[in-house]
């Protein structure tokens, strides 16, 4: 049975340990920079082979708006905005709370090239995924997709030329009957 299964996409993902448990610099030592070869055989017997470069150039997460807990008018478009990502994660540095610190890529001898952004907006009824260019800085969600008194979670992904990506998550609610505190309560109840 397993011999007849195949893949349409392949992503290497894991549940990374908290930085307090395993500092990023140690985590990245497990996956050294360099070229990696992948080989496989399709169901029809054709051999596949690929070589990819793995880098430690990790873009910092985009700074996003609206701020978490913002309540928007459902009759108006919701505009998700972000700043251009110009910094990278410094794997050797964290702040007092164990969060990563961003720095100019030149400080680490790196070049950062944002290839594209992706925005995901979702709740129980919608799952919107939009791919955007590296020049784009906003996504407008039309009011036709918004419902009254509803929580929406969004993610803005910054995708680096190497394929590395970082996600910033946010959320907003629509009115007219929800307050910012209600919106926060809805998010925390997930």
What is each residue range found by the language model?
Residues 1-19, 124-131:
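Extended, solvent-exposed segments with strong compositional bias
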Residues 115-119:
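Short beta-strand elements bearing conserved aromatic residues within extracellular beta-rich modules
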Residues 11-38:
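Ligand-binding face of N-terminal immunoglobulin V-set domains in extracellular IgSF glycoproteins
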Residues 44-51, 159-189:
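Extracellular fibronectin type III
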Residues 31, 37-45, 143-168:
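Beta-strand-rich modules
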Residues 46-63:
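Proline/serine/threonine-rich low-complexity linkers at boundaries of modular beta-sandwich domains
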Residues 72-111, 141:
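Conserved aromatic anchor
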Residues 23, 126-128, 134-142:
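Short S/T/G- and acidic-enriched coil/turn segments that sit immediately N-terminal to beta-strands
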